[in-house]
């Protein structure tokens, strides 16, 4: 049975990472430490900039987050690729949430701009993805634009995030 709530808490995200939310062989989130948000505060098939869906998630920033200790010594900053990965994770979650079958894989993006950095002094990161298109054929493909804000200021913008859901053995190499 598909779980179609409008928001998800941390324990729900962990259940998704264990393959319990969308069924065996379907979209999963990574488990910690690669799970890059603490909750999904909004998910809808009708909202967003393009009217085709939106996902909004939050990460509570704490100075002891795993990446601050190694990136970089005496100059801690969240790696930009982790913020990007969070947006791909959200597109994959959306595809599973809408009933798409298969295992999720990030397939690329059109453009990415950083205008700031996430520091351990921040309190909250908000991620947003606006779904532009979902195609359902041999694979399920989602395309979205996204942004990341730190304490209210948008500091990452991504265009044309692409995520596919692939049946067992069909994922790109």
UniProtKB/Swiss-Prot annotation:
Which Pfam families does its entry note? FabA
Write out the GO biological process terms.
unsaturated fatty acid biosynthetic process
Q: Does the keyword Lipid biosynthesis apply?
A: yes
Q: What is its EC number?
A: 4.2.1.59, 5.3.3.14
Q: Kindly indicate whether the keyword Cytoplasm belongs to this entry.
A: yes
Q: From the UniProt record, list the reaction(s) this protein catalyses.
A: a (3R)-hydroxyacyl-[ACP] = a (2E)-enoyl-[ACP] + H2O; (3R)-hydroxydecanoyl-[ACP] = (2E)-decenoyl-[ACP] + H2O; (2E)-decenoyl-[ACP] = (3Z)-decenoyl-[ACP]
Read off the HAMAP family from this record: FabA
Q: In UniProt terms, what function does this protein have? A: Necessary for the introduction of cis unsaturation into fatty acids. Catalyzes the dehydration of (3R)-3-hydroxydecanoyl-ACP to E-(2)-decenoyl-ACP and then its isomerization to Z-(3)-decenoyl-ACP. Can catalyze the dehydratase reaction for beta-hydroxyacyl-ACPs with saturated chain lengths up to 16:0, being most active on intermediate chain length.
Q: Which family does it belong to?
A: Belongs to the thioester dehydratase family. FabA subfamily.
Task: Cite the record's note on assembly.
Answer: Homodimer.
Name of the protein this chain belongs to: 3-hydroxydecanoyl-[acyl-carrier-protein] dehydratase
The organism encoding this protein is Bradyrhizobium sp. (strain ORS 278)
């Amino acid at each position: 049975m598909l779980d179609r709530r409008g928001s998800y808490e941390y324990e729900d995200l962990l259940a998704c990472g264990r393959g319990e939310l969308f069924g065996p062989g379907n979209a999963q989130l990574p488990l910690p430490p690669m799970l890059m948000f603490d909750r999904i505060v909004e998910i809808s098939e009708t909202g967003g900039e393009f009217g085709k869906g939106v996902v909004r998630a939050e990460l509570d920033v704490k100075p002891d987050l795993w990446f601050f200790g190694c990136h970089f010594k005496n100059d801690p900053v969240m790696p930009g690729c982790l913020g990007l990965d969070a947006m791909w994770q959200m597109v994959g979650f959306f595809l599973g949430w809408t009933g798409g079958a298969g295992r999720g894989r990030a397939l690329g993006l059109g453009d990415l701009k950083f205008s700031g950095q996430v520091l351990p002094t921040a309190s909250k990161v908000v991620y947003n993805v606006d779904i532009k298109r979902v195609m359902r054929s041999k694979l399920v493909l989602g395309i979205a634009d996204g942004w990341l804000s730190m304490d209210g200021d948008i500091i990452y913008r991504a265009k044309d995030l692409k995520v596919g859901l692939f049946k067992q053995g069909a994922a790109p190499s």
